């Protein structure tokens, strides 16, 4: 991938790196940026984008795997369905992990510049929950889209940051569209500002069908668990994710159908033990 000095991308890289002068300290925070057909600042709030008719297929994951391994990028394909331990037939579900995918796209040794670009933004620390505006403790959020939007939490609208302010995120988004041979997706940010306190429990992404995500910061595992009739079925699966890693979910692995009771569905979680330690849904 050729680099052209003087471009907006190059200037953003230089500015971001200067903003975090000195050696990078071990991060105690983890950021996840999720590219998908739909984004939202919090469950039940404004949705951005239109739901696609289908998610990524196993064949699409394989194409991405082969393209990147040919470029020397370490990739790992995981089958989730063999870990379902129930009585009924189960759909195949796959997860593709791309090691240091961010570094590969940006041609950097780390994610310092990308984290700095996000740290410069005014993150959503409030959300509308059960009719009330409350402080967000589990994580902070943002959505990225074509136009800026100031938050109106009482109306269920969070902050949206336009692509023009985030050239590094935009570059990765465009790369994802290219390698998947798909349209550019929306982007949703989850900022786990303290990995010892933050997280998200077992859930499926019922708002979207496509997930191609990137991580930056401290290492933090992604967990998966099969469910049926609201009960865990089979062992919990743990996938280690590190600074700059990307992951791509095949359609079933997204968990779009996670609220269905009778069929086997798979949910995912991440963060501290409060959110990931128990696979049983909170009553």
Predicted regions and their residues:
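Intrinsically disordered, low-complexity regulatory segments of nuclear proteins
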Residues: 2-4
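Non-heme Fe(II) oxygenase metal-center motifs and adjacent flexible, charged/small-residue loops
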Residues: 8-283
């Amino acid at each position: 991938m050729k680099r052209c000095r003087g471009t907006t991308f190059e200037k953003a890289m230089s500015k971001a790196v200067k903003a975090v002068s000195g050696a990078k300290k071990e991060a105690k925070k983890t950021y996840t940026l999720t590219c998908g057909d739909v984004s939202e600042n919090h469950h039940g709030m404004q949705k951005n984008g239109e739901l696609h008719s289908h998610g990524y297929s196993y064949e699409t994951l394989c194409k991405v795997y082969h393209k990147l391994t040919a470029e020397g990028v370490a990739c790992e394909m995981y089958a989730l369905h063999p870990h379902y331990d129930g009585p009924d037939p189960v759909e195949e579900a796959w997860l593709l992990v791309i090691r240091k995918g961010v570094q590969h796209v940006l041609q950097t040794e780390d994610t310092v510049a990308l984290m700095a670009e996000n740290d410069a933004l005014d993150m959503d620390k409030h959300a509308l929950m059960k009719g009330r505006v409350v402080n967000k403790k589990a994580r902070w959020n943002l959505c990225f889209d074509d136009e800026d939007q100031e938050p109106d939490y009482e109306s269920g609208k969070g902050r949206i940051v336009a692509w023009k302010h985030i050239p590094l995120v935009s570059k990765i988004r465009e790369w994802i569209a290219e390698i998947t041979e798909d349209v550019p997706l929306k982007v949703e940010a989850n900022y786990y500002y303290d990995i010892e306190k933050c997280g998200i429990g077992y859930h499926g992404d019922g708002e979207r069908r496509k997930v191609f995500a990137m991580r930056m910061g401290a290492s933090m595992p992604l967990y998966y668990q099969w469910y049926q009739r609201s009960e865990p079925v089979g062992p919990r699966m743990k996938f280690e994710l590190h600074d700059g890693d990307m992951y791509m979910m095949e359609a079933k692995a997204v968990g779009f159908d996670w609220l269905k009771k009778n069929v086997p569905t798979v949910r995912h979680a991440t963060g501290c033990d409060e959110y990931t330690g128990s696979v049983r849904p909170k009553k």
